[in-house]
Amino acid sequence: MESLVNPHVLQITPYKPGKPVEDLQREFNLKKIVKLASNENMLPIPERVRNAIDEELSQVHLYPDSDNHYLRQRLAEYNGLQLDNVIVGAGSVEIIHMLIRTFLKSGEKVLSSEKTFSLYKITTTEIAGESAYVEAPMSQDLCFDLQAIACKIDPQTKIIFITNPNNPTGTFIHAQPIRDFIERVPSDKIVVLDNAYQEYIDNPDDYVTGLDEIRQKKNVVVLRTFSKVYGLAGLRVGYAMAKPEIIAILNRVKAPFNVTRISQRAALASLESEDYKNESVRMNRANKAKLFSQLQSLGLRVIPSQTNFLLFFPKMDVAE
């Protein structure tokens, strides 16, 4: 069978998502499980979103709006951009795939950091082979080392992924270093700011959203998601913002009807549910501080986090 397969696919180490609670209960014969593996929002979605989903159920025999027009329009307003600055995907994972498939030419490379979101490497390997993905080392405090990344940029570099805050370390990069880094990147490269956990940042004034860079027509793409603070992980809605020229090219490869009717309606309703978003952030901050303290009291090394999860180092090999 392997002789029939694209050799790039054979190089992939598959992504391992967190298992559903039902699978874990069955596998380990447990009744109660607190699932923290997938960085999900444990707060039930607000009534406004539930009502929007219920209303849309009667229309699921019809295809969704393939252009995602109303959601894109609202996202543009929400972020102070124009309609042609926004594209919507079935989770930001779909857009990551679109970006690499669209812009990575033969012989070019994707650059990011070690210990970051594994889908960058998996997708690059699928499309261009394992050798097309380049990792820079992290700093000692498990942050993206922008200087190390800058040193890896060469003529073959095409796309640079910066995850801020980072998954899985929870660390973040202050605003000025990112601005300085973007200024250093040659104009024939694309910088992707994956801001999936942006809402959890403690100090928004010290954070680069990427929106100013988009307005300045730089080759910057910003990724956002409804899976975290908005609690819509099961509906798969993400979006990207960039200058119109980049969005227009991405629309050439976007699958038709890629975001369901229910997902579009739920996302629109979520954008009108600021109280829910604020409560999600408040609850996360309080519980994260409590868990951080408790883990430290066990003598464990815990990394300060600007996300909805914590990275800690157990005193034993987890494989055991």
Regions found by a protein language model. Give the residues of each.
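PLP-dependent aminotransferase-like
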Residues: T102-K158, I162
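Short acidic capping loops at alpha-helix termini that bridge into adjacent secondary structure
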Residues: K32, Q82-V86, S106-K109, Q156, ...
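Short beta-strands and strand-loop turn motifs
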Residues: K35-A37, S131-E135, I159-P165, V191-N195, ...
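N-terminal small-domain helix-loop-helix segment of the aminotransferase-like
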Residues: E2-V93, M98
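PLP-dependent aminotransferase class I/II
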Residues: N219-Q296, L300-I303
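Active-site pre-lysine segment of PLP-dependent enzymes
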Residues: C143-P155, P168-V191, N195-S227
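Conserved PLP-binding catalytic core of the aspartate aminotransferase-like
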Residues: M138, Q294-E320
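Short hydrophobic alpha-helical segments of the AMP-binding
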Residues: L75, T124, V185
